[in-house]
């Protein structure tokens, strides 16, 4: 049986991959990574360090479009509820990749015990494909406990830069459209050019009129009813201090969402 691990570029999926490689061997394991064309440059260093540690080659896929290009082609402003980038740049090509492989296959995803609510959908979707089962190596005994960076650091692999800056993920150079207000504040503080590029794109989409005029990447839920909160209007909210530093990892669902 062949084992396929989808790597997100984060530490949790790296620990999951290591467990699969240890249990089944590199000769029976394929590691797959989808590049969104928006990644932080240090993510590539992290992947290269993992390849050197495991002595394997990671299969890399790149559509060529950025998440914002995917969203613009779909005539939407992406947010936590609607993010076609995840499906178009990661899920769909991964499905095509595993569909053409000889079966049986076990697909391994890097979700841990804190994310059990996220396991149901990808397990059901991938197991629709004949000959495929889904497993979650971080749930094997002993159950992997976050922060997973402690494990990758024990291999001599440096933690990705975004975690060190306090981001809870290593997605899209800190620009994940599913992230919350604090992460956008953090991006504005640590990578102002990246923040402005997204904020300017969002404003341009809203100015096109139609349904997009009333949507935004972020929502203001301060008064209980969610309303659009354009990034250009985002400031550090009164009484809320932005804290930089390390963070728990991989708390934003991206790859496995449908």
Residue ranges and their predicted role:
Residues 1-258:
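Nucleotide-activated chemistry modules centered on ATP-dependent adenylation/adenylyltransferase
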């Amino acid at each position: 049986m062949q084992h396929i691990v989808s790597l997100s570029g984060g530490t949790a999926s790296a620990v999951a991959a290591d467990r699969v490689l240890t249990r089944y061997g590199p000769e029976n394991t394929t590691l797959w990574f989808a590049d969104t064309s928006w990644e932080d440059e240090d993510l590539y260093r992290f992947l290269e360090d993992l390849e050197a540690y495991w002595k394997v080659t990671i299969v890399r896929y790149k559509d060529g479009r950025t998440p914002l290009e995917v969203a613009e082609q779909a005539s939407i402003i992406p947010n936590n509820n609607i993010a076609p980038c995840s499906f178009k740049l990661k899920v769909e090509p991964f499905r095509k990749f595993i569909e053409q492989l000889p079966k049986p296959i076990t697909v391994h995803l890097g979700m841990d015990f804190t994310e059990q609510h996220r396991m149901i959908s990808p397990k059901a979707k991938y197991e629709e494909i004949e000959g495929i089962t889904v497993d979650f190596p971080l749930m094997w005994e002993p159950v992997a406990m976050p922060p997973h960076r402690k494990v990758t650091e024990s291999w001599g692999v440096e933690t990705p830069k975004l975690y060190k800056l306090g981001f809870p993920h290593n997605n899209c150079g800190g620009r994940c459209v599913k992230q919350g207000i604090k992460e956008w504040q953090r991006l504005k503080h640590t990578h102002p050019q990246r923040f402005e590029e997204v904020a300017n794109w969002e404003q341009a989409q809203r100015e096109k009129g139609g349904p997009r005029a009333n949507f935004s990447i972020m929502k203001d839920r301060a008064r209980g009813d969610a309303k659009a909160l354009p990034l250009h209007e985002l400031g550090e909210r009164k009484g809320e201090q932005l804290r930089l530093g390390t963070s728990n990892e991989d708390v934003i669902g991206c790859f496995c969402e449908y």
